[in-house]
A protein has these predicted regions:
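Conserved amphipathic alpha-helical interaction elements at protein-protein interfaces in regulatory
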Residues: 25, 114-118, 134, 145
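Active-site acidic-Proline motif in GNAT/NAT acetyltransferases
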Residues: 96-98, 102, 130-131
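Short polybasic/polar patches that bind polyanions
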Residues: 100, 117, 140
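C-terminal "cap" of GNAT-fold acetyltransferases
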Residues: 122-125, 129-136, 141-169
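Residues that form or flank phosphate/diphosphate-binding pockets in enzymes
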Residues: 14, 103, 134
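Short coil/turn segments at alpha/beta junctions that flank glycine-rich nucleotide-binding fingerprints
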Residues: 86, 102, 118-122
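Acetyl-CoA-dependent GNAT
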Residues: 6-98, 106-111, 115, 150-152, ...
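Extreme N-terminal starter segment of soluble prokaryotic enzymes
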Residues: 1-5
Length: 169
């Protein structure tokens, strides 16, 4: 069973481990690089979790004792960040290889969407690398559509992100 944990700054070791695993497993899917974060100290990890108004979520597979106890396995993460004019950003979605196909990504997206609505958001927006078909399919299944606006440059500027959004109204 999958349990979601809303992270606080005290959860920085868990977030660090998940973030490094994501950057190591899927470097093609993120603007940040493993080298950018690999040597970050506790202060840097805590600061990322302390962004005002942000919502950080970890997914854990229950261990034999159940719930998200010490034997639970961290398998995924997602972040929600506040933006201007009612826009909320979905960022850093990742699910580890052993947990893929179990609905973990669906649960993470549903939780960030719940937060976005509860925090007064009118739009949930994301950026994804063109060609990342598993992610694009996931986002479309959750009601996101591609916007005409160009995304930011990706990996040296050769590729631009695909911007997708979903109305929360």
């Amino acid at each position: 069973m999958v349990t979601l944990r809303i992270l606080t700054t005290d959860d920085w070791p868990l977030w660090r481990d998940l973030r490094l695993a994501a950057l190591s497993d899927a470097p093609h899917a993120f603007k940040a690089r493993l080298a950018d974060w690999h040597h970050g100290g506790e202060g840097r990890w805590r600061a990322r979790l302390h962004l005002p108004g942000a919502h950080h979520v970890a997914a854990l597979l229950d261990g034999p004792a159940g719930s998200d106890g010490p034997d639970a396995t961290p398998v995924g993460l997602a972040d929600g960040l506040p933006g201007a004019d009612g826009v909320r950003e979905l960022r850093s979605v990742w699910v580890g290889p052993k947990a893929r196909g179990r609905g973990v990504a669906d649960r993470l997206l549903e939780e960030v969407e719940r937060w976005a609505r509860a925090s007064g958001g009118s739009t949930l927006r994301l950026a994804v690398l063109p060609g990342n078909e598993p992610a694009i399919t996931l986002y479309r299944r959750h009601g996101f559509t591609v916007l005409a606006e160009p995304g930011g440059p990706f990996a040296g500027g050769a590729t631009r992100e695909l911007v997708m959004a979903k109305s929360l109204r």
